[in-house]
Amino acid sequence: MQRIVSICPSNTEILWALGLGENVVGVDDYSDWPQQVADLPRLGPDLEIDMDRVQALRPDWVLASLSVPGMEKNIEALEQTGIPFLVLYPGGLEDIPRDFLRVARFAGLEQRGRKLADRFKKRLETIRQKIPQDRPAPRVYWEWWPKPVFTPGKENWLTDVSRTVGAINIFGEEEGQTVQSDWRTVAERRPDYVFAVWTGVPMKKVRKDKMMNRPEWKDLPCIRENRVYILDEGWYCRPSQRILTGIEHLAHLLYPDRFAPSDPDNPL
């Protein structure tokens, strides 16, 4: 049986979706889904993986990622170990089913990857077909980090997620995966909704009251009308099958007359 190490949370989730969970022998500190990962050896934060611990697990291969700036040093360190590895670098939403197939091929399970990718695409299309076309497109601001402000740009899956639900990412025309900005610029772009998905931060630690009281935002209708939502970053910041749960939840927030609440236990 192949021994696999995953050093990124979204990769861990993809391995489980492909039925390779029993092959995983170690994960990064932030991998927390599904529940079975709780008992696996931890190898450090996803930006500071301990390669000595990786080598000690004697993996047949490592599933790495470049989904977050700074992960490049993990790749450089892996190259020094001589352990075979596969690197995922998801940009848009369409890269997620492609990554299913890439991982499956690397594991010698191409047919399984094709089936998973097809299911992902079909469910995504089902969501798209239910989005109302006769309403103004809501303008949304995604907050990945508050200070300094980081938000998804043009080449980011959350821009595609916004488009999927008939919305417009107010930074969606800015080049790059991630854009650095400030609260005043956000206010000038007049979002209809604010979605906070602070990377690596549990929902309970995100202070909505402080967001609502930012002086730069005091005149925004979305603040006055309480259209500020703290969302589960695991549904939006990880390019895996669970992003479908996030998309369905977003659609429910925007169109409650069309979409029921999403089912977190059935991502795909």
Predicted stretch roles:
Residues M1-L268:
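N-terminal ligand-binding lobe of clamshell/alpha-beta domains
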